Amino acid sequence: EFGVGSHRNGTLDHDDLVFGNHGFQSVERVLTPTVFAFLDRYRPETLRPGLYHADGQQDGEVFEAGSFRQSRMHAAGVRCSDCHDPHGGKLRRPGDATCTACHSPAGDARFPSAGGRSYEGTDHHFHASGKAGSRCVDCHMPSRNYMVVHPRRDHAIRIPRPDLSARTGAPDACTACHADRTPAWSAAVLEERRKASGTAAPGPH
C-alpha cells in the first residue's frame, strides 16, 4: 500500500514499481518504506548468452524490463505508462495507434524526434495494409513463444538490422516470416528500398 501511495505522491518513478514485476533479476533488498528505487532493491540480469542474443534481443524468457531499459525509447524518457494503463496493463490505444500517437506528423511534444512524418503506409513497412508485416510490432517488437503458449514481444523496440543478424546470428525480424530467405537477403532488400526512398542509412546499433 505504501508503494502505491508513494507513487501517487510523486516520490517514485512508476517504472520502478513496474520493473520489479516485469523483469528478470534477483532481489538484493526487501521492500521497505525507504527502499523503492528499482536499482536499490534489485540486481538486474546482464545481457549475457542464454538470456540475450549478441545484439541485445531477447533469447531466454527475460520478460520486458531488461529489453525496455536498453531501448532508445526508454533513453528518450518514454515510460511504461505512456503505452500501458498502469493499473490493468492493457494498451492505452488499440493496435498501431499505440505507436502513431508519437510516430506521426502531429507527434507528441514530449518526444519531438519521433514525429514529423507518417509511418503507416506501404512505403514504410513494404506490406499490404492489414496483412502480416504491416503492423508496427511485426518488425519492431517481434514475438517469441515461451513454454509453448506464452508469447512475449521484445520491448527493446529496435529498428530491424538484418545486416547485423547476418554477422551475429541474432534473429532477423524479416526472416521470422520469410523463413525461406536469409538475413543477407533481407539486408539487400532493405538497402535497395532505402536508397530508392532516399532514407538515411541506419546509424550504430
List each model region and its residues:
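Primarily the internal scaffold of c-type cytochrome electron-transfer domains
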Residues: 1-205
